[in-house]
A protein has these predicted regions:
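Conserved N-terminal Rossmann-fold NAD(P)-binding element of oxidoreductases
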Residues: 33-34, 56, 160, 198-199
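Rossmann-like NAD(P)H-binding beta-loop-alpha module
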Residues: 189-211
Length: 211
């Protein structure tokens, strides 16, 4: 079964690639599109294996995890945990003044945590590993060719690690209240009195827990 499956995949791949001309030589071994968690790990592994790697990103290095996901959400949860512990201190025989939240300072610490981790996902670090980092909009021309704002680069393999973006659901009236998303929420400087979170995924659950 494994041999048959491999043959079937090879035939399907040949049919898929039949409309494109494969270059005789390549500019690089591997192109990674997207510098989020998946893209950075892929580029790192490729560079570790001594492959020539080109990493393409159009926005911020680190992607969702560093800038609007894992890192800021954990920093916010840490602040929320401290607040919860102080509220329960009396149960442990510890008297503390009623804690107050300075939300602007909380968000300032969140940004500082991001800045602390940024160097690990930076262009400088990956350039030091031998990765060629490019900023721009990548567009697939063929299975081996990528256009980056007019510059064409060929590679033996291409990895798509472009991630995703928040989707605003079609709920009547939602567009009239200027809803936040998991990307724009981090711009808040005042703690909202009420917050409705639509979506029970990892980030949604973390934000609900923290707020």
């Amino acid at each position: 079964p494994l041999i048959v499956r491999a043959v079937v995949k090879a035939v399907e791949r040949r049919k898929l690639y039949s409309g494109f001309k494969k270059p005789r030589t390549f500019d690089t071994n591997l192109i990674v599109i997207g510098a989020g968690s998946g893209g950075l790990v892929s580029a790192y592994i490729g560079a570790t294996l001594k492959a020539r790697v080109t990493l393409i990103e159009r926005d911020k290095m680190g992607g969702d995890c560093l800038n609007t996901g894992c890192v800021p959400s954990k920093a916010l949860i840490r602040a929320a945990k401290s607040m919860a512990e102080m509220k329960k201190a009396a149960q442990l025989g510890i008297d503390v003044p009623a804690p107050q939240v300075d939300f602007a300072r909380v968000m300032g610490r969140v940004r500082n945590v991001i800045k602390t981790i940024e160097p690990h996902d930076s262009v400088e670090r990956f350039t030091g590993l031998g990765v060629d980092c490019l900023y721009g909009n990548a567009r697939l021309i063929s299975p081996w060719l990528v256009d980056v704002d007019g510059q064409q680069i060929s590679a033996e393999k291409i990895i798509l690690a472009t991630g995703a973006r928040p989707t605003i659901p079609s709920i009547p009236g939602l567009d009239q209240v200027e809803p936040l998303t998991s990307e724009t929420l981090w711009q808040l400087q005042e703690l909202p009195e009420r917050l409705l979170i639509v979506g029970g995924g990892a980030i949604g659950c973390e934000l609900a827990q923290a707020f």
